[in-house]
């Protein structure tokens, strides 16, 4: 500041004679100092203001660099799309539950508005602290007997059946629990196009066609209302970046397609396990949440799960509800074991599952084995 005053005083536009005069007059000297200060003060203020602006600009630029450098998950606020494929080719067979495809979408957190809000409050007992989502899905499943060469009915084997459906679901989640209620509705029978899909795929890959689709279950609209609850419990905290948890679950399904109660648990080992509740599957299998939290890094976990089901109705085994059709003697209890691997990077998740399902009807020779693959992406 003093340097600025001296510079301003030395350059002020005042006659030298005036300074000689001012030196002999105190009042004039005060006036000269005032004029010099008046000239110097704005210049000093301008220099100080420029310095402050440069400092603020530098801070903003540095903050911008830090924000840019900080890894941000690209799908943190997006919905989740998932494509599921399940097939017994992974078990080396072509029988019973032989193929399933499903495309699903689960929304980001959606609040308590719309149709899902009242459903979540009334049926899932959700409140404003819960994270509520809704989901839509379409899918198709196919079932065939063990002998796919025969054209005649095979009363001791799984009936031919196709199932095409749509699904609406609502989810309510807090930190460590997930509740879901959903409705599947669709068509069983020729209109589900199971024969067309299976035989065209077999022709495309050069394998034998299934010859007995004329004996499949008749067209019948069907539905099932489903409820599931899952809880996450951490067994071992983070050690070397890894965790161990267990996700027990219970469920109930009621409808013309399927009526059952189920319970089971999944054990998981890996990193950042709070990203989801397990891998997505096609029901009636024990599935995960259908969505996950995006992460800017690579994550993975191994899992093994088991479930028991008490089954009161299975249309694919019991046959058509109002028409005579093929059927088998259904077993009232079914067990399922699954294990696999889930990998995630940013907004992508890939899961592989191998499944062993116990005998579902009396004439079934052995438990069924099949594989499941799912690809999920958030956008």
Regions found by a protein language model. Name each.
Residues 152-156, 209-215, 251, 323-327, ...:
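Extracellular loop and loop/strand-boundary signature of outer-membrane beta-barrel proteins
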Residues 122-196:
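Long, hydrophobic/aromatic-enriched structural stretches that serve as scaffold segments
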Residues 95-101, 160-164, 179, 219-225, ...:
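Residues that define the transmembrane beta-barrel architecture of outer-membrane proteins
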Residues 105-107, 140, 170-172, 229-233, ...:
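Residue-level signature of outer-membrane beta-barrel architecture
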Residues 81-87, 134-142, 183-189, 229, ...:
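Transmembrane beta-barrel strands of outer-membrane/channel proteins
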Residues 40-41:
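N-terminal signal peptide c-region/cleavage motif recognized by signal peptidases
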Residues 67-78, 109-132, 173-180, 233-246, ...:
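Short loop/turn motifs that connect adjacent beta-strands in outer-membrane beta-barrel proteins
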Residues 146-150, 266-379:
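Outer membrane beta-barrel transmembrane domains
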């Amino acid at each position: 500041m003093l340097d600025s005053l001296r510079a301003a005083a030395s350059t002020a536009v005042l006659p030298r004679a005036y300074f000689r005069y001012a030196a002999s007059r105190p009042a004039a000297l005060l006036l000269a100092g005032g004029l010099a200060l008046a000239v110097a003060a704005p210049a000093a203020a301008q220099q100080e203001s420029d310095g402050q602006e440069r400092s603020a600009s530098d801070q903003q630029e540095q903050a911008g660099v830090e924000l840019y450098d900080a890894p941000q998950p690209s799908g943190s606020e997006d919905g989740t799309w998932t494509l599921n494929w399940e097939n017994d080719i992974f078990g080396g067979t072509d029988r019973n539950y032989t193929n399933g495809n499903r495309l699903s979408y689960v929304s980001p957190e959606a609040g308590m508005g719309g149709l899902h809000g009242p459903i979540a409050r009334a049926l899932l007992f959700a409140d404003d602290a819960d994270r509520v989502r809704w989901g839509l899905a379409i899918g198709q499943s196919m079932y065939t007997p063990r002998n796919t060469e025969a054209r005649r009915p095979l009363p001791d084997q799984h009936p031919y059946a196709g199932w095409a459906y749509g699904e609406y679901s609502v989810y309510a989640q807090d930190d460590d629990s997930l509740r879901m209620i959903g409705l599947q509705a669709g068509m069983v029978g020729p209109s589900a196009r199971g024969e067309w899909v299976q035989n065209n795929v077999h022709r495309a890959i050069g394998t034998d066609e299934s010859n007995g689709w004329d004996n499949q279950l008749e067209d019948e609209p069907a539905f099932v209302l489903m409820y599931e609850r899952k809880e996450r419990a951490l067994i071992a905290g983070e050690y070397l970046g890894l965790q161990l948890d267990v996700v027990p679950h219970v469920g109930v399904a009621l409808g013309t397609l399927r009526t059952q109660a189920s319970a089971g648990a999944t054990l998981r080992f890996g990193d950042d396990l709070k990203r989801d509740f397990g891998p997505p599957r096609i029901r009636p299998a024990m599935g995960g949440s259908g969505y996950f939290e995006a992460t800017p890094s690579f994550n993975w976990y191994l899992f093994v799960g088991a479930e028991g089901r008490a089954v009161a109705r299975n249309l694919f085994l019991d046959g058509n509800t109002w028409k005579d059709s093929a059927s088998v003697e259904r077993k009232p209890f079914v067990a399922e074991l699954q294990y696999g691997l889930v990998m995630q990077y940013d907004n992508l998740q890939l899961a592989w599952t191998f499944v062993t399902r116990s005998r579902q009807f009396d004439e079934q020779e052995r438990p069924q084995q099949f594989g499941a693959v799912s690809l999920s992406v958030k956008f």
